[in-house]
Amino acid sequence: MENSDDFIVITVSGPDAPGIVSSITSILSENAVKIIDIEQIVIRKLILLSMMLDLRESKGGQISLLKDLLLEAKRLNVELDFKIASYDEHLQHDNNFMYAVTCLGEKITAQVVAQISNAIYSENVNIERITQLSQGELSCIEMIVKTDKTINVQDMTGKLLSISSDFGVDIAVQKENIFRRSKRLVVMDMDS
């Protein structure tokens, strides 16, 4: 049986600067902490870094580690928050089905995002991550969604079809896996 304090999730947020990830992970390394999951994003010079940590083989204990992390966060001028996680939360991450919902169009407005996210929510599916994939004249966003049950991709695409026609955007739904990004199709019109 795992102890209830063997896993923690830390979240670092604040003004971005070089060395934040290096400083935080150096402390984790010195304490022999295993990183189970990690995600970082910087938006307009604001960093958000989250990690799920396995402390089962760490040195020094949870209190000492958290003290070191909080002091380093203060020195770096960022906020550090933590949550004690359970072993079950760690296992649940692996027992979910992931899908990618991609939206492409001239303009992807808040109304488009609201309609897509409402359709996803109506299926009791959670949006895990939203990423902008493009810059410039054409907009493209990708939502990685997670559910504890498999969904019918054709049914979900059908629900999103009305949004597609109402707002002049293209929406695709596909399973999220390692092979998804390697599929590419290039069409060249040589007649002109």
Give residue spans per PLM region.
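Asp-based phosphoryl-transfer active-site loop
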Residues: 184-192
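A conserved regulatory-domain signal marking ACT and ACT-like small-molecule sensing domains
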Residues: 1-184
